[in-house]
């Protein structure tokens, strides 16, 4: 307009369509569908029920970033599957050659799945945190179960994990961008990702149709 002010819709247009706009952060925009699904889940749940949401996907695809974003908005309890890294005593050739077994799912079920089966809003779940550097559980973490429990990380959709899921999210990434991110943040373990962890993840995705 000549005065430099903001252009407005005409009265006729506003009356007919009632337009409304929101400005959101660019980090949130790619996940609007996720927020909509979670909001719908929360709106339709029983007052005494705690929904479980999982985020699985390729390494480097942004699982932890999305989990942090969801926590900042909902203040939900977050459990990381990295805290259930497989201890050395269980890393047998047979187990590691079986898709989806590269996680201590037995401990996950004992500490998380069983508690989640009876949890109510406001309850807390306490579990041990595995330290990969020390090769053992060195600390514990307590997470809230309100308004929902979020399970973040590779293998969170594994059928060996018996927790009841209400919403499952899968994140993907191009091979080129995946390698770039790994080289940037895990340079010292780049070879392990290429030769071990990525192939194991891909076998797991294919074996159980996780992307579906």
Residue locations for each model-derived region?
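Short hydrophobic/aromatic beta-strand immediately N-terminal to the Walker A/P-loop
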Residues: 52-54
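ATP-dependent NMP and nucleoside kinases share a basic, alpha-helical "lid"
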Residues: 136-185
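Conserved lysine of the Walker
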Residues: 63
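Conserved nucleotide-sensing/catalytic segment adjacent to the nucleotide-binding pocket
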Residues: 77-80, 86-142, 148
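P-loop (Walker A) phosphate-binding loop of NTP-binding proteins
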Residues: 58
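Charged, amphipathic alpha-helical linker segments immediately N-terminal to NTP-binding catalytic cores
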Residues: 1-33
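Small-molecule kinase domains that catalyze NTP-dependent phosphoryl transfer to phosphate-bearing small molecules
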Residues: 1, 7-9, 158, 163, ...
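Hydrophobic positions on the alpha1 helix immediately C-terminal to the Walker A/P-loop
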Residues: 66
């Amino acid at each position: 307009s000549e005065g430099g002010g903001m252009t407005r819709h005409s009265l006729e247009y506003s009356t007919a369509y009632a337009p409304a706009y929101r400005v959101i952060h660019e980090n949130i925009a790619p996940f609007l569908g996720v927020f909509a699904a979670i909001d719908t889940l929360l709106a339709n749940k029983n007052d005494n029920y705690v929904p479980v949401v999982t985020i699985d996907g390729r390494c480097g695809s942004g699982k932890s970033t999305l989990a942090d974003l969801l926590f900042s908005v909902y203040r939900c309890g977050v459990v990381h599957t990295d805290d259930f890294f497989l201890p050395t005593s269980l890393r047998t050739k047979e187990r590691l050659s079986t898709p989806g077994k590269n996680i201590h799912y037995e401990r996950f079920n004992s500490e998380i799945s069983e508690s989640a089966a009876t949890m109510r809003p406001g309850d807390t779940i306490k579990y041990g945190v595995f330290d990969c550097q020390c090769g053992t559980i060195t600390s514990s973490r307590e997470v809230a179960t309100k308004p929902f429990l979020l399970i973040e990380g590779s293998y969170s959709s594994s059928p060996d994990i018996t927790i009841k899921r209400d919403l499952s999210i899968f994140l993907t990434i191009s091979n080129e961008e995946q390698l770039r991110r790994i080289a940037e943040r895990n340079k010292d373990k780049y070879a392990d990702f290429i030769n071990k962890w990525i192939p194991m993840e891909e076998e797991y995705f294919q074996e159980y149709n996780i992307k579906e």
